From Swiss-Prot:
One of its GO terms (cellular component) is cytosol. It is found in: Cytoplasm. Pathway: Amino-acid biosynthesis; L-proline biosynthesis; L-glutamate 5-semialdehyde from L-glutamate: step 1/2. This is Glutamate 5-kinase. The gene is proB. Pfam families: AA_kinase (PF00696), PUA (PF01472). Substrate binds at S56, D143, N155. It catalyses: L-glutamate + ATP = L-glutamyl 5-phosphate + ADP. GO terms for molecular function: ATP binding; glutamate 5-kinase activity; RNA binding.
Length: 379
C-alpha cells in the first residue's frame, strides 16, 4: 500500500518525547535539533496546516536544571521536578516558534482531562480557538498533579487522546526508533521495518517491545495502544525516528517510518461514536425551520429550539426531535439543561447576553451533530 504524503493532511499533532528533547549526557535541551524541528513545523504551518505539539520533557528538564542524580525518582520528586521543568519547557517552545513568526499557547492536561466531559470540552474549545488564531498549541502533560502519566508512561496515549480531541487527521509520534519492526532490531540484525499497518491485530501487538530509555518511559507497547485510540477515532498515525535533524522533512522525503492507517476520518468517526455509543440524557424539540437548517448541514441555534426535556450536563448526548416528535438526530449539547432552557427560542445575540458570553451561541455545533435518527424523516 502506498504511504500518504504529509502535505495531504490539514491538522497534524506532533508528539515529542523526553529522550529527543533533552541531551541527558550534557544535561540540557538539544537546541539545534529543536530549532530544526521548529523549522519543519513552520513549513507545514506556512502551507496552511494546523499543527499541534504534544511535548514531554518537563520532568527530564526539571531534573536536569535541578542537577538531580540519575536513577528513578519518587513520585513527589518527579512532580517537583516537573514544576521546575514546565516553566522552562514553555519558554523554549515559545522561543523556537517565535523565531518563525508563530505564536505558541501552552495547555497543561492530564489523562483525566481527555476523559471527563466538561474538562474535555473546555480543552477542545481552547485548542480550537488557538488554531483559529493560527497559533501552535503546545500541550504538555501536567506532571505536577498527574500520577499515572509519570509512573506508566501514558504520554503516547495522551497524545492520541489529544489528536482525537482536536479532530486531527494525523498523529506523528517522534521516537528513538524508525518505527515498528517484526523483531527487536537491537537483538536481531535481520529485523524488518513494518512500513504500513492497515489494522492493529494481535500479531501487530505481539511485535511491540517494552524497552524504554531512562528519560522516556513509553515503549513501543504504548505506541501501539496510541495507534488503536487514534485509528478508531479516524486519525492516521505514524511512528518515525526523531533523532535526526528535520525529522518531519525526512518523513516528507520518504524516510523510514511506520504508518497506521484508518479508513475513517475524524468527523465520520466522531459522528459514528455520537450516534451509536452514547446514552442520550435528554431531548431538544425543534421547529421546522431548524429541521431544514440541520439537514442543510448547519449548527443548531437556540432560536430553533422549542422545548427542553431531561436533566443533562454540558457535553452530554441528547436526542433532537422535529415538530411531529420524530427523531431528527443526536448531538452533544453545548449547555446544561438549565442554561439550554433559558436560551431556547432566543436569537444568538440575546442568548449570548443572557449567558454573559461573547460571540455566536450554538446549542449544538454541527461537528457534534448527527442528522438522521433511527425513526426516519421527521418533518
Amino acid at each position: 500500500m502506498t504511504r500518504p504524503h504529509l502535505k495531504k493532511f490539514r491538522r497534524i499533532v506532533v508528539k515529542v518525547g523526553s529522550s529527543l528533547l533533552i541531551d541527558s549526557a550534557a544535561g540540557k535541551v538539544r537546541g539545534e535539533w529543536l530549532s530544526a524541528l521548529a523549522a519543519d513545523i513552520a513549513g507545514l504551518h506556512g502551507d496552511g496546516c494546523d499543527v499541534l505539539v504534544v511535548s514531554s520533557g518537563a520532568v527530564a528538564l526539571g531534573r536536569s536544571k535541578l542537577k538531580l542524580p540519575r536513577g528513578p525518582l519518587k513520585l513527589e520528586e518527579s512532580q517537583a521536578a516537573a514544576a521546575v521543568g514546565q516553566i522552562a519547557l514553555a519558554r523554549i517552545w515559545s522561543k523556537v516558534l517565535a523565531d518563525h513568526g508563530i505564536g505558541a499557547g501552552q495547555i497543561l492536561v492530564t489523562w483525566q482531562d481527555t476523559e471527563e466531559r466538561r474538562r474535555y470540552l473546555n480543552a477542545r474549545s481552547t485548542i480550537a480557538k488557538l488554531l483559529e488564531w493560527r497559533a501552535v498549541p503546545v500541550i504538555n502533560e501536567n506532571d505536577t498533579v498527574a500520577t499515572n502519566e509519570i509512573r506508566y508512561g501514558d504520554n503516547d496515549r495522551l497524545a492520541a487522546r489529544v489528536a482525537t480531541m482536536a479532530s486531527a487527521d494525523l498523529l506523528i509520534l517522534l521516537s528513538d526508533i524508525d518505527g515498528l519492526y517484526d523483531a527487536p532490531p537491537h537483538l536481531n540484525p535481520d529485523a524488518k521495518l513494518i512500513t504500513v499497518v492497515k489494522r492493529v491485530t494481535a500479531d501487530i501487538e505481539a511485535m511491540a517491545g517494552s524497552a524504554a530509555s531512562e528519560l522516556s518511559r513509553g515503549g513501543m507497547r504504548t505506541k501501539i495502544e496510541a495507534a488503536k485510540i487514534a485509528t478508531t477515532a479516524g486519525t492516521h498515525m505514524l511512528i518515525a525516528s526523531g533523532t535526526i535533524e528535520h525529522p518531519l522533512r525526512a518523513i516528507m522525503d520518504g524516510g523510514p517510518c511506520t504508518w497506521f492507517l484508518t479508513p475513517a476520518n475524524p468527523v465520520t468517526a466522531r459522528k459514528r461514536w455520537i450516534a451509536g455509543s452514547l446514552e442520550p440524557r435528554g431531548t431538544l424539540a425543534i421547529d421546522a425551520g431548524a429541521v431544514a437548517a440541520l439537514r442543510a448541514g448547519k449548527s443548531l441555534l437556540p432560536a430553533g429550539v422549542t422545548r427542553i426535556d431531561g436533566h443533562f450536563a454540558r457535553g452530554d448526548a441528547v436526542i433532537v426531535r422535529g415538530p411531529n416528535g420524530h427523531e431528527i438526530g443526536r448531538g452533544l449539547v453545548a449547555y446544561d439543561a438549565a442554561d439550554a432552557d433559558r436560551i431556547k427560542g432566543r436569537s444568538s445575540s440575546d442568548a449570548a447576553q443572557l449567558l454573559g458570553v461573547r460571540g455566536r451561541v450554538e446549542m449544538i455545533h454541527r461537528d457534534d451533530l448527527v442528522v438522521g435518527g433511527p425513526l426516519g424523516d421527521s418533518a
